[in-house]
Every structure is written in C-alpha cells, then in structure tokens.
Amino acid sequence: MFKPYNLEQGKFLVRLARRAVEEFIRSKRIIKPPEDTPSRLLEDNYGVFTTIETIREDGSTELRGCIGFPRGNVNTVKATINSALAAAFDDPRFAPLDVNELESVIFEVSVLSPLEEAKFNSPKELVNLVKVGVHGLVIERGMYSGLLLPQVPVEYCWDTVMFLDEACEKAYLRPECWAEKGTRVYTYEAQIFREKGPRGDVYERDLIEELKKCHLDEA
C-alpha cells in the first residue's frame, strides 16, 4: 500500500490546504511553504488532489470542488497549495468558494503514487487487475482523458466494471472504452487525509474498511 506519510504530516497537508484557500480569499495572496514544513514534504514530488465538500444540515456532504494534478511535477507542499486553490476557485462545475462558506466545508487531501500503465491482454485481465478500494484510474484515448480517485467507487459502491465504465465517461468516452484497443489505462494508489468536520481533527481514510459497507462480495 502507498503510505508515504504519517498522520502528523497528513494533518499538516490538510491544514495547509485550508490555510491556502482562506488566505487567498482574504488577501488574494498565494501562500508560500511555511517555515515549519516537514522536510520530507519538500523533498517528495507526488501528485495531489484536494477535495472540498459542504456539510448539509443533516450531516451529509456535497461536493464543492475537486481538482488536482496526477503527476508529481512539484514538491508535495506546492502541489497541495496549488490543488487547494484550484479546487476552491477554478472548478468549472462550481462558483468560487466564498468566505461565508469556510465554516461549513471539509477539506480532504489525496497524495497520489506515480501512475502505472496497466498491462493486460483481455478485458477480463484488466477487471482482475483493478482493485476497488486500492486503485484510482486514469483513462486516456487520443485527446481525451479522465481521472477518478480511489475513494470515488467506494463512496458509490461501484464494482470494478462500473468503476472502469465511469472512468471512461469522465473522459467523455463510451462507458466500454476501457475494453477497446487503443485505450490506455493507468492505475495508482492514494493516501487520503480528511477533516472530520470544518477545522476539525484530521484522520487518514481506510478505503478497504469503508468498502465493507458496500457488501460487494455478496452481490
């Protein structure tokens, strides 16, 4: 399993993501890596996605923004700052985050392992290769590409085929594109740190444990 960071480092990243967004809302300034940044986070270059969710009155959550960078072209700290700002202000599905929302949103940071192209000789081999609760997916075909984080199929209780189909649709392709010649499929893992509530304690998600609620083996 891909777990490069301990919980304290994960807490740092989540709080950094929130701080970056709050500072930009208030001053339009992009923060720099803080002086107390753990050195490991400045040395590693990993892809990072930030997810922002709104908490409803009934305690459920609703997506408010999710953007990131799957390939580690900068260090993890800079990638976290950049992805947090993009999720808050540049997600085309939503209006920019407002200062009045800061007390009702949760931040989640996903640190991605390097992408690995899946090697398979048949659709069945690919289905056996991709593990829900472990892998995220990137689908590429021609000029089209789509990415789904590992937590997405767990949250929706998708099986592997549905996960692959949805990744194709995310790339604006036919659901079955993953089984067609010429489509490139990449897998990766993610270490996911999340606030329990707005400004709350940070914990590391265990997708395998969360997946048990889906009872996919019983279907």
Swiss-Prot record:
It comes from the Archaea. Signal peptide: none annotated. NCBIfam families: AmmeMemoSam_A (TIGR04335), TIGR00296 family protein (TIGR00296). Pfam families: AMMECR1 (PF01871). SUPFAM superfamilies: AMMECR1-like. Residues 8-204 form the AMMECR1 domain. This is Protein Cmaq_0360.
